[in-house]
Amino acid sequence: MTQKLDTLQAAIERVIGDRIVHLVRDRGELTLTVKATDYAAIGKTLRDHPDLGFEQLIDICGVDYSGYKDGGYEGLRYAAVSHLLSVQHNWRLRLKVFAPDDDFPLVASLTPIWSGANWFEREAFDMYGIVFDGHTDLRRILTDYGFIGHPMRKDFPVTGHVEMRYDPEQKRVIYQPVSIEPREITPRIIREDNYGGLH
């Protein structure tokens, strides 16, 4: 395993070169961080270069770093993290890119390179609000079309903004402000008369 990682790391350093922002080796895995401006081009290189051969994209997920290290993190807030697999070389790589603008997180789409990125990018858009430039059908995939916000962002309220319920009078589903009834959070302890041998 170590020799294989050495080979992969050397190939990445040779092929990608000075476009590498970070190349971290931890727990038997490599994570390559690149600039947003180089993201799509490096993705294509990772797929097409014979020494790398990452022909399969396994997953893309969004990350919100605003609460990272208990709020002590001072870098860019949003990242898209892709997991790549090379079947021919039997190795994996994590590819990370940070969106340069926290107010409007935008990175290039990988769908022209790996068509399987389609729904993963839609999920990252829906959950984190990361916009993938060049995606041909970037719309919500997990939340309702009328949903407001992006629920996996650290600043999204746990209760949400609205709740939906079926209204029998209107005979349809309606949205209304969240109404959470206060409840007692102290657990009740019920003990028998002779609990633990005590009288």
Swiss-Prot record:
GO cellular component: plasma membrane
Pfam families: Complex1_30kDa (PF00329)
UniProt key word Isomerase: no
Bilayer-crossing regions: none
Catalysed reactions listed for this entry: a quinone + NADH + 5 H(+)(in) = a quinol + NAD(+) + 4 H(+)(out)
Top EC category: translocase
Membrane topology classification: Peripheral membrane protein
Cellular compartments annotated: Cell inner membrane
GO molecular function list: NADH dehydrogenase (ubiquinone) activity; NADH:ubiquinone reductase (non-electrogenic) activity; quinone binding
Keyword Phosphoprotein: no
Keywords: Cell inner membrane, Cell membrane, Membrane, NAD, Quinone, Translocase, Transport, Ubiquinone
Signal peptide as annotated in the record: none
Family annotation (SUPFAM superfamilies): Nqo5-like
EC number per UniProt: 7.1.1.-
Subunit structure: NDH-1 is composed of 14 different subunits. Subunits NuoB, C, D, E, F, and G constitute the peripheral sector of the complex.
Cited function: NDH-1 shuttles electrons from NADH, via FMN and iron-sulfur (Fe-S) centers, to quinones in the respiratory chain. The immediate electron acceptor for the enzyme in this species is believed to be ubiquinone. Couples the redox reaction to proton translocation (for every two electrons transferred, four hydrogen ions are translocated across the cytoplasmic membrane), and thus conserves the redox energy in a proton gradient.
Family listed: Belongs to the complex I 30 kDa subunit family.
Protein's name in the database: NADH-quinone oxidoreductase subunit C
Native species: Leptothrix cholodnii (strain ATCC 51168 / LMG 8142 / SP-6) (Leptothrix discophora (strain SP-6))
